């Protein structure tokens, strides 16, 4: 008989490994080279249990775009909000959860990409494993 608890442990371990690969990754373009491990995590100013790693900011991109790693603790949420004038994208790296994007519920699983145009209400809820996202904003959020 298959031991489902061991399969779940392996799934969580693999998710953590994938996230750590991003967490310790790098960004390279001709004008910018940055190691993600050198960027500190900061607490989200509004949502408890949410941390951000600002990979590229407005300062580095002339305001054109910004990239962020987002870590949402198990059972925590980024509640309903909008961005104006930013378009936001989420790439789910690891963990599980849900996103309510313009009233539509999306299962957030590794490999899912979601796009929130400017002024569209959205929220994100982490499951029991937590949730790890790569978020991008056009123009830059910060």
Per-region residue spans from a language model:
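Conserved short histidine dyad/triad with adjacent acidic residue
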Residues: 53-56, 66-83, 118
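A short, N-terminal "cap"/entry segment at the start of jelly-roll beta-barrel domains
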Residues: 1-64
């Amino acid at each position: 008989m298959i031991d489902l608890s061991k399969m779940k442990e392996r799934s969580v371990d693999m998710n953590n490994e994938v996230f750590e690969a991003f967490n310790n990754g790098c960004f390279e373009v001709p004008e910018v080279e940055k190691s993600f491990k050198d960027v500190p995590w900061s607490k989200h100013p509004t949502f408890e249990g949410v941390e951000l790693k600002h990979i590229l900011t407005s300062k580095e991109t002339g305001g054109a775009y910004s990239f962020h790693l987002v870590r949402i603790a198990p059972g925590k949420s980024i509640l309903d909000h909008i961005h104006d004038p930013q378009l936001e994208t989420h790439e789910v790296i690891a963990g599980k959860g849900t996103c309510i994007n313009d009233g539509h519920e999306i299962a957030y699983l590794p490999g899912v990409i979601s796009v929130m145009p400017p002024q569209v209400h959205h929220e994100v809820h982490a499951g029991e494993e937590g949730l790890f996202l790569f978020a991008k904003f056009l123009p830059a959020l910060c």
